[in-house]
Amino acid sequence: IPIAYSNALTIINEDSEQKYLVENNMEFLEETSIIKSFKYNDNFIRPYMVSSCNYDFLIANNGVQTPFKYELNYRNYILVTEGDIKLKLAPPKSSKYLYQEKDYDNFEFTSPINPWDIQSQYKADFDKIKCLNISMKKGQILFIPAYWWYSIEFGENASIASFKYKTYMNMVAISPHII
């Protein structure tokens, strides 16, 4: 739902139920010209022969957790711009235990399982998975490989810059998902 940035911050700060996540902010990045800074400073992480760059800025209240999901992009980076976050990562071989849901309308690949508080009906399967737990602070960047499952838990006043890249060969490789 498109809303003003100041209103989004108010909603997040007053979010006592930890349910609001602000993401998919490409329009905001373009209107504020932050996108120029992202493009100028991503030379070290942008791959050669890139066909698509997707930048995003994520903010949420303390304790908010993103759904467990994976990306098909050739490269996925997250940069903590404020505060601290925690991540749970699982390798692609874990997919058979995660009841993956493929949403081709939004091009999202998620799991109904909450890796931070596993629901009882998924406990037996989730116990077969080994998750990598990572804590990150302001200024740290992390590369998340394609098809790796991840979920982010936001700390106090945390914000994240996200950089996602597709190359021409990556587009060919994921064409069965696109067509």
Describe every region a protein language model picked out:
Residues 1-141, 149-179:
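N-terminal accessory scaffold of Fe(II)-dependent oxygenases
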